[in-house]
């Protein structure tokens, strides 16, 4: 059985993932040209590398098309309804840190918690004749957090296709759920994160698809052990 590991195809995520695998004794070499989307691991004949976008990696792990992937936890949990049943977060890799957060306009002085926001949402229709609008690319995580964790039902999600942080200023939404590393972009757009509004503290992870063929497979166990040993 050949084990396929999906890695980010470009950028810092690709470089940092490759560095971790090299420290783990799994040096990656390109197959073909530098622009090839395939790779191999030197000395591991039963392992191949596939280079994909971060969102593609989350989808391919969920479908079982690849065995491992390095991608953000936020993308996996947003893309898969039952993430923990379908994948195993085998290792947290210590880079790509970012938080998925609830942010509201700074001028909402009396709104500092999700409970405060729940009160606003309940009152919003009476005051404005519509539901509270939330701009986000994370509709699944938003629904789970608002409805599941905090019992807030009176809202609607506006799909964000561009810069989510600009939605309140443009009038397309009232608040946002977005990912942030430093919070500086939110502050620049006069938004504040609620005190209990961190939905997920995400980072890059080595994620394994839960497949029956992995049970008792020494290559699977060896990969996980090698990566964990260098973290």
Curated annotation (Swiss-Prot):
The keyword Zinc-finger does not apply. Disulfide bonds: none annotated. One of its GO terms (biological process) is L-histidine biosynthetic process. Its main location: cytoplasm. InterPro entries: ATP_PRibTrfase_cat, ATP_PRibTrfase_CS, ATP_PRibTrfase_HisG, ATP_PRibTrfase_HisG_short. Pfam families: HisG. Keywords: Amino-acid biosynthesis, ATP-binding, Cytoplasm, Glycosyltransferase, Histidine biosynthesis, Nucleotide-binding, Transferase. SUPFAM superfamilies: Periplasmic binding protein-like II (SSF53850). Lacks the C-terminal regulatory region which is replaced by HisZ. Catalyzes the condensation of ATP and 5-phosphoribose 1-diphosphate to form N'-(5'-phosphoribosyl)-ATP (PR-ATP). Has a crucial role in the pathway because the rate of histidine biosynthesis seems to be controlled primarily by regulation of HisG enzymatic activity. NCBIfam families: hisG (TIGR00070). This is ATP phosphoribosyltransferase. It comes from Rhizobium meliloti (strain 1021).
């Amino acid at each position: 059985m050949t084990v396929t590991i999906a890695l980010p195809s470009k950028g810092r995520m690709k470089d940092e993932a490759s560095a971790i695998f090299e420290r783990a004794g799994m040096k990656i070499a390109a197959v073909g040209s530098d622009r090839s989307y395939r790779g191999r691991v030197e000395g591991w004949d039963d392992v191949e590398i596939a280079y994909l976008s971060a969102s593609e990696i989350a989808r391919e792990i969920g479908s079982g098309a690849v065995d491992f992937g390095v991608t953000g936890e936020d993308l996996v949990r947003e893309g898969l309804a039952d993430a923990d049943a379908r994948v195993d977060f085998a290792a947290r890799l210590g880079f790509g840190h970012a938080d998925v957060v609830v942010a509201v306009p700074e001028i909402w002085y009396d709104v500092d918690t999700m409970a405060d926001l729940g009160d606003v949402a309940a009152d919003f229709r009476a005051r404005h004749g519509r539901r509270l609008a939330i701009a986000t690319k994370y509709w699944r995580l938003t629904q789970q957090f608002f409805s599941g964790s905090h019992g807030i039902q009176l809202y609607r999600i506006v799909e964000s296709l561009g810069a989510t942080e600009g939605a309140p200023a443009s009038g397309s939404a009232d608040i946002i759920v977005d990912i942030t590393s430093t919070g500086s972009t939110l502050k620049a757009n006069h938004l504040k994160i609620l005190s209990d509004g961190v939905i997920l503290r995400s980072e890059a992870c080595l994620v394994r698809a839960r497949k029956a063929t992995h049970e008792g497979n020494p290559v699977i166990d060896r990969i996980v052990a090698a990566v964990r040993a260098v973290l």
